[in-house]
């Protein structure tokens, strides 16, 4: 850690460099050159970061778009140090994404940010190549913002533009979401709905054929009442991590007809599948 211990830490990799954020106070972003691991001759070895980037404080997550060479720390809760244009009590850019240029991996610098939606818990950033021709080639941010989802064009780092906002029924904590590989659908997990409303693990699917006009498509309910956490798509599969029900693989090949089904799972907490944190 760059400062103190914390339960929350996130790491993403770009060009053989690990970018590390944490909710530890004043942590900023550590940059570590992973190629240093190739020359280890005797273990154990305690490494220090190559860069301790302190232009923002704590953050819950970090997102990287490898195509553009930008990192996006989200969930910042401390005021910034050097990039003060949007400082406020809620953190740099009010806890929204910070636009960090990492095209030279060990020389990060902030180019801007987006504060229009307040705190962002997690996000996906893509160079868009989907069905909406208005945004082909644009850099699109989709943020899970606790009680809604925001879609933002962040191509121009000094002038991000909100495209649309998504609300849905029985919202409790909009935690994380991910595009299908064709960018047509966005699959969302609400972390606390099982605790708040009961029922089995709920996954929400939105049709994003038109980014300006997202449409709720359908809900999928898993076989257990466990709390869901993060989910990612690979091809025709959606891999969903759950607190007490392990990793579930869901076949999404028939998502167009609103038919998705679990095909296998790996249980990491065999004691029970209750809607509790572990």
Label for each model-derived stretch:
Residues 1-278:
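Feature marking well-ordered beta-strand scaffolds used for ligand recognition
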